[in-house]
């Protein structure tokens, strides 16, 4: 039986197995505390997320179960990978995943991104989205802080706590405002995978501009900023996606003409602007899919249809159709933990040798106590494809 060690991290009790050492706080959110740690079996740095009060009510228990199931099911190079999961003596749930040096939000606030970075990050983001959507999953909370990046320019999408099945009726409060699709603001219940494409488009635009494209102060201001760029939504679109209340409001707005994309991104690649124009469209049915976006000329240098996999199976959402008690959710989570350890992660752990640190301003929390980089190369073709000036930019 595993031995557990107890630590106090930011006033929170952290109970981890003796497999992990050198815990350091990385981030604290509403639903979990994340620490970096050192895995003494694989000799790799990892991230350990403690799910906050997972069994305090049925809603949090369901959310915990959903995230565990999703991380077990979704296995892709551009998604955060689950390497371990355990339940502590205090009955807290801990998820152990890859640890990458920084996230896109931190990167965007540290220095402007060169166009080659924007192109490669866009490719990986859409490559990951293609896989997620092929599993019948909508992320629903894509934003720069949920996009992790390491010193090799490898990108992984994380935080599936809000992910959902695509279905006709869906709850509305999802995604950070700046990256929220207009159909979510206008209808609050009817939307699909296209909301992720909108969010991804906002992220690409932010990489190109160096600042958010639609930094709304509230929902109304957010929608006005969108219409400043795209013009008023067509009547047939708002009649399809709006509720009666929002329909009257949108139709009463002053008429605005769309702004030429080139004026919003004067120094950007024409192909990048063209792709943005296909991602940021009011009508969700006309938005480009992730799979089609990968075929766009802007991404032709990286596009490889033989290396852009889809999920082998659709994700099983049947658990969401039943109202379980807290004890039932607890048993289901325990079962998933046992199943994970019976099967194990799909990939063998990779042991790497220490190498030089990247620019500290890029990855301020990237080093473990031994001076090793807390990442490993993910997409092997990145080292082959990125040219030398990109590597020098990251000081690798």
From Swiss-Prot:
Residues with the Phosphothreonine modification: 171
Keyword tags: ATP-binding, Kinase, Nucleotide-binding, Phosphoprotein, Serine/threonine-protein kinase, Transferase
Residue span(s) of domain Protein kinase: 20-299
Motif (TXY): 171-173
Catalysed reactions, semicolon-separated: L-seryl-[protein] + ATP = O-phospho-L-seryl-[protein] + ADP + H(+); L-threonyl-[protein] + ATP = O-phospho-L-threonyl-[protein] + ADP + H(+)
Enzyme Commission code(s) on record: 2.7.11.24
Domain of life according to the entry: Eukaryota
KW Phosphoprotein (keyword) present: yes
PTM summary: Dually phosphorylated on Thr-171 and Tyr-173, which activates the enzyme.
InterPro entries linked: Kinase-like_dom_sf, MAP_kinase, MAP_kinase_CS, Prot_kinase_dom, Protein_kinase_ATP_BS, Ser/Thr_kinase_AS
Class of the enzyme per the UniProt entry, highest EC level: transferase
Binding residues for ATP: 26-34, 49
Modified residues (Phosphotyrosine): 173
Protein activity control: Activated by tyrosine and threonine phosphorylation.
Family stated for the protein in its record: Belongs to the protein kinase superfamily. Ser/Thr protein kinase family. MAP kinase subfamily. HOG1 sub-subfamily.
Comment field on protein domains: The TXY motif contains the threonine and tyrosine residues whose phosphorylation activates the MAP kinases.
Protein name: Mitogen-activated protein kinase mpkC
Organism expressing this protein natively: Aspergillus niger (strain ATCC MYA-4892 / CBS 513.88 / FGSC A1513)
Gene, per the UniProt record: mpkC
């Amino acid at each position: 039986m595993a031995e557990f060690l107890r630590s106090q991290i930011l006033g929170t009790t952290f109970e981890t197995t003796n497999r992990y050492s050198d815990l350091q706080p990385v981030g604290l959110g509403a639903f979990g505390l994340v620490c970096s740690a050192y895995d003494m079996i694989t000799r790799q740095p990892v991230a350990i997320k403690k799910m906050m009060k997972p069994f305090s009510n049925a809603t949090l228990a369901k959310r915990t179960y959903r995230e565990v199931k999703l991380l077990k099911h979704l296995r892709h190079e551009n998604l955060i990978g689950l390497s371990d999961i355990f339940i502590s003596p205090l009955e807290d749930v801990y998820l152990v995943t890859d640890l990458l040096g920084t996230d896109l939000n931190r990167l965007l606030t540290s220095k402007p991104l060169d166009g080659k970075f924007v192109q490669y990050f866009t490719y990986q983001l859409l490559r990951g989205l293609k896989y997620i959507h092929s599993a019948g999953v909508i992320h629903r909370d894509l934003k720069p802080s949920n996009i992790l990046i390491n010193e090799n320019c490898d990108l992984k999408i994380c935080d599936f706590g809000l992910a959902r099945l695509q279905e006709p009726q869906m709850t509305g409060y999802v995604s950070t405002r700046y990256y929220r699709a207009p159909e979510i603001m206008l209808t609050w219940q009817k939307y699909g995978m296209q909301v992720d494409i909108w969010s991804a488009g906002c992220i690409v635009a932010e990489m190109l501009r160096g600042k958010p494209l639609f930094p709304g102060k509230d929902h109304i201001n957010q929608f006005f900023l969108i219409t400043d760029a795209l013009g008023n939504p067509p009547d047939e679109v708002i009649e399809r996606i709006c509720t009666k209340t929002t329909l009257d409001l949108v139709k009463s707005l002053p008429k605005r003409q769309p702004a030429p994309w080139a004026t919003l991104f004067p120094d950007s690649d024409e192909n990048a602007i063209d792709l943005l124009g296909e991602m940021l469209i009011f009508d969700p049915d006309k938005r480009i899919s992730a799979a089609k976006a990968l075929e766009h000329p802007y991404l032709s240098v990286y596009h490889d249809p033989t290396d852009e996999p889809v999920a082998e199976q659709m994700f099983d959402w049947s658990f969401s159709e039943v109202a379980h008690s807290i004890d039932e959710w607890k048993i289901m989570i325990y079962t998933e933990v046992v199943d994970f350890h019976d099967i194990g992660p799909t990939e063998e752990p990779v042991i790497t040798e220490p190498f030089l640190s990247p620019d500290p301003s890029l990855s301020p929390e990237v080093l473990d106590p031994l001076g090793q980089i807390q990442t490993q190369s993910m997409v092997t073709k990145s080292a082959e494809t990125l040219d030398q000036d990109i590597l020098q930019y990251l000081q690798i």
